[in-house]
């Protein structure tokens, strides 16, 4: 178990809509550098920060979902390598444990690889460990800044796409899981597009799937939406079909944890049935993700390892049993949406539509790789 401690902050769910919640930050107090995480498992009841002083603490936080969401996992992984280097731990061992902390989100391994490559290059160039640690930290900060810029670009491209697909505004958008500032170095992925529409007066309502079993929609997306003052409504996952049938969904916007070379998308479990509903009801189904989420080394969705979460996440609620003792639970964290069901993939480089392998390859550089390929 790693070394971490908590700091409880004042809870203000309304906040400042122009200041996205920072999911993580690097600090250098007198006792040594730390990575500070906003503990997402405690939201919305309380705002608590985890202060990680070593890599085991960060790995524990990643596996426990205190920090989650593909883009920010990449940033956390890069900072984790820097943390190991700055504090004098075995950097290669740290990188291995970080890259394998969660198997599906490709950004985690990508961030680890970038910081590790910078560290090794500095050592190979004759630098001492201190200079190599500084190089790893600089790379982590660069990735953090790049993701903030990517978030803003995705918001612009996504807003333009909505205007083309749904002229006239007044959007009613359905989203799944959580894709705001909590998963990003900026204002998010899909939620950044929603927020841009809200700021321009184009959003009528955001429909928020609760996102069973860990309720990331109810706990996190509703929390972020409330801070902005946008109109939003929470619904159970099983109510989505009736919402489509009533004509109350104009578009579905989701994020992604990994996008394969053929355009199929791994995202929070429950995304695939929304894509099927959207196709049946002739509603645009849009994926918003940075190019770091595109894994050209994974041919198709069948090659993506799907994380299986503990059964108690389904059989218990807030520690209380909701199923008979001994009940087995099927609890995949993600599912795969085929490219054929996706209207468009929005990246910082532009929009892929229709979603084909060639179109995706042309817009997205081949730089993200799975954790098994990451550290070489």
Where are the language model's segments positioned?
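Histidine-anchored nucleotide/phosphate-binding helix
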Residues: 188-199, 275
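Short beta-strand segments
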Residues: 38, 76-80, 111, 174-178, ...
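Ligand-binding beta-strand-loop-alpha-helix segment within the catalytic cores
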Residues: 110-173, 202-204, 208-252
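Conserved phosphate/anionic-ligand binding catalytic regions in large, soluble enzymes, centered on
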Residues: 64-77, 107-108, 178-186, 330-346
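Long amphipathic alpha-helical segments
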Residues: 5-6, 20-127
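Generic structural signal for well-ordered, non-membrane alpha-helical segments
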Residues: 51, 55-58, 70, 74, ...
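Short, hydrophobic/aliphatic alpha-helical segments
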Residues: 50-66, 89, 167, 171-175, ...
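Conserved phosphate- and dinucleotide-binding cores of soluble alpha/beta proteins
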Residues: 203-204, 209-376
């Amino acid at each position: 178990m790693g070394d971490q401690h908590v700091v409880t902050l004042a809870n203000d769910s309304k906040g400042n809509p122009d200041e996205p919640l920072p999911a993580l930050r690097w600090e250098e107090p007198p006792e040594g550098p730390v990575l500070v995480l906003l503990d997402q498992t405690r939201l919305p009841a309380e705002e608590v920060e985890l202060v990680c002083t070593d890599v085991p603490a960060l790995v524990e936080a990643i596996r426990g979902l205190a920090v989650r969401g593909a883009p920010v996992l990449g940033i956390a992984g890069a900072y984790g390598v820097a943390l190991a280097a700055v504090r004098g731990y075995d950097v290669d061992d740290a990188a291995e444990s970080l890259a394998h902390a969660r198997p599906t989100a490709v950004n985690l391994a990508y961030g680890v690889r970038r910081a590790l490559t910078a560290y090794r290059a500095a050592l190979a160039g004759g630098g001492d460990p201190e200079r190599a640690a500084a190089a790893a930290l600089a790379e982590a900060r660069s990735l953090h800044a790049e993701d903030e810029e990517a978030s803003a670009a995705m918001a612009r491209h996504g807003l333009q796409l909505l205007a083309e697909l749904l002229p006239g505004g007044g959007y009613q958008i359905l989203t799944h899981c959580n894709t705001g500032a909590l998963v990003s170095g900026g204002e998010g992925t899909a939620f950044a597009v929603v927020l841009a529409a809200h700021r321009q007066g184009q959003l009528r309502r955001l429909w928020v799937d609760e996102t069973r079993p860990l309720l990331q929609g109810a706990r996190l997306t509703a929390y972020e939406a409330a801070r902005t003052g946008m109109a939003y409504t929470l619904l159970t996952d099983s109510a989505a079909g009736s919402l489509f049938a009533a004509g109350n969904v104009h578009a579905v916007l989701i994020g992604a944890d990994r996008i394969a070379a053929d355009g199929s998308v791994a995202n929070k479990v429950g995304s695939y049935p929304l894509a099927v509903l959207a196709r049946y009801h002739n509603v645009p189904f849009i994926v918003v993700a940075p190019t770091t989420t595109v894994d050209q080394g994974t041919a198709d969705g069948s090659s993506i390892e799907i994380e299986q979460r503990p059964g108690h996440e389904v059989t218990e609620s807030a520690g209380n049993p909701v199923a008979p003792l001994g009940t087995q639970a099927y609890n995949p964290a993600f599912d795969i949406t085929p490219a054929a069901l996706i209207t468009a993939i929005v990246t910082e480089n532009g929009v892929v539509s229709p979603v084909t392998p060639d179109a995706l390859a042309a817009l997205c550089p081949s730089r993200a790789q799975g954790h098994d390929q990451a550290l070489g």
